[in-house]
A protein has these predicted regions:
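ATP-dependent adenylate-handling active sites, centered on carboxylate activation for C-N bond formation
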Residues: 1-6, 10-11, 18-26, 30-250, ...
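Conserved S-adenosyl-L-methionine
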Residues: 254-259
Length: 365
């Protein structure tokens, strides 16, 4: 194992080194592998991506050929953020870009543009999972812009929430052991959800996404951290380990900002409109007979029914339907974590706003 990864991770400097080692390995490799095009930063969940951006910016400033001694006049690090106008993630991504000095690109999409893309998105991501469809659509639209600029690769902050328990429902974890076991479950299912979204939404336009937080050596260290240190009981901020390690190189408004899931952070009206449109498109009678039409993983609400209908048009086989996970979830939890809090019982809402008493409304549409 790299010597850097053997240090004690309780110290702030050591935490930084572990993450920087993972990110630098990716960014250094990229400068040789992307045929002269710049490495770019895709701003999804702002805190996680901001950490990777700051590290990438550090290494992009020097020439590898001179062992990082000479300044690099080219390429410049570009950053990207996508969302509806006024979305909370756009505002914070803009702050980070200004703070670390990237060439920033802010891509606005309209709700109608998102709705028009849903059918194609479901085809490319090959799932009808509600959260994945919601979040993949803006990422798909973002990837189109990135590709149009001739860019081949982006870095992303995927995996940090799974490793450090960043989702808001983790506030309800009853014990360190339960917290750790849930992070393991989340990591084991990433290929069905967030990594599927990031990979296939980008690959639909020929863009490669790389994820330093899922670097194997980094995971080997991060998953050995005492889960009691990662926990965020009550109103304590989530992912405190990461925030403390990088608070000095990020804007404070970002370093200590509450988690917003990507599908929320791009604009709350995106999810609310999807719910309204699908509720109007699927009748009560159709829902009443959902089990007859879809005996495998029967849709539990109209939004899921709508996506499932499109999915079946693209992939009509039973094996395709079975390949998609279908379990109840609150704020992207696993089914096992629903036992953590009485308010979770009977709920099936993947939005972070579903965690009562924890989520603080970031803005109003």
């Amino acid at each position: 194992m790299n010597a850097v990864l053997r240090v004690r991770i309780s110290a702030k400097q050591s935490k930084q080194k572990v993450i920087i080692t993972a990110a630098s390995r990716v960014t250094h490799t990229d400068k040789f592998n992307i045929c002269g095009r710049e490495a770019k930063k895709d701003a999804t969940t702002v805190l996680d991506c901001s950490v990777i951006s700051a590290i990438a910016k550090k290494y992009a400033a020097k020439r590898i050929e001179t062992d990082n001694k000479a300044d690099a006049w080219w390429p410049q690090l570009h950053s990207f953020a996508v969302g509806l106008k006024g979305a909370p993630d756009l505002i914070k991504a803009r702050e980070v870009a200004h703070h670390i000095g990237t060439v920033h690109h802010e891509i606005n999409y309209t709700v109608q543009e998102g709705l028009d893309a849903v059918r194609d998105v479901i085809y490319f991501i090959e799932t009808y999972d509600i959260t994945t469809v919601r979040a993949s659509t803006p990422m798909y639209l973002l990837a189109r812009v990135i590709k149009s600029m001739g860019i081949k690769m982006v870095l992303s902050g995927e995996g940090a929430d799974e490793v450090f328990g960043g989702y808001l429902y983790f506030h309800k974890a009853p014990t360190p052991q339960a917290f750790h076991e849930e992070t393991v479950r989340k990591l084991s299912k990433l290929h069905l959800y967030d990594c599927l979204r990031a990979n296939k939404s980008l690959a639909a336009w020929g863009v490669e996404g790389r994820v330093p937080f899922l670097d194997k050596e980094f995971l080997d260290v991060a998953m050995r951290i005492n889960p009691a240190v990662k926990m965020c009981p009550g109103k304590e901020i989530e992912k405190k380990v990461v925030r403390e390690a990088f608070a000095d190189i990020l804007p404070q408004s970002v370093a200590w900002r509450q988690k917003e899931q990507f599908s929320d952070g791009v604009g709350y009206s995106w999810i609310d409109t999807l719910k309204a449109v699908t509720a109007a498109a699927v009748s009560d009678e159709q829902m009443a007979h959902a089990a007859e039409r879809f005996p495998i993983h029967t849709p539990q609400n109209k939004e899921e029914y709508y996506y499932r209908t499109i999915f079946e048009e693209h992939f009509p086989s039973e094996s395709a339907a079975r390949s998609v996970p279908s379990v109840p979830s609150v704020a992207c939890s696993t089914a096992e974590a629903l036992a953590w809090d009485a308010s979770f019982q009977g709920k099936n809402d993947p939005s972070g706003r579903a965690v009562a008493g924890v989520h603080e409304e970031a803005y109003k549409d």
